Amino acid sequence: MENHGGPTSTAKGLLAIAEDVDSDWFGVNLDTGNFHSDDVYAELAAVAPHAINVQVKVVVSGPDKVKHPTDFARLAAILNAVNYRGYIVLEYEEAGDPRTESHAYLEKLRAAFA
């Protein structure tokens, strides 16, 4: 299940569902750009133990929808703290040329997880 609107738009709502599913085959596709609270990183940390895949967007935003660069080092610390061992996917949805911009962000992401 992905944190993508509706009842999954907050960590509390997503966890209410995720923790009710009693199956080793169920997990969260954690999208770093889909929480829009006052503390996006706290929400990511709350859900991280349930993550089986992580889609890293290059920006995060709060309730005001103002975009801020994703703090890759902070994200890496959150995922390392829960011993995350799944895939990490870079998802670039910004205005620049993805072929050019994605490479630079991928290098930053690799450095954060090194």
What do the predicted segments below correspond to?
Residues E2-H4:
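Short, well-ordered beta-to-alpha junction loops that form the rim of enzyme active sites
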Residues P7-A114:
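Histidine-acidic metal/acid-base catalytic patches
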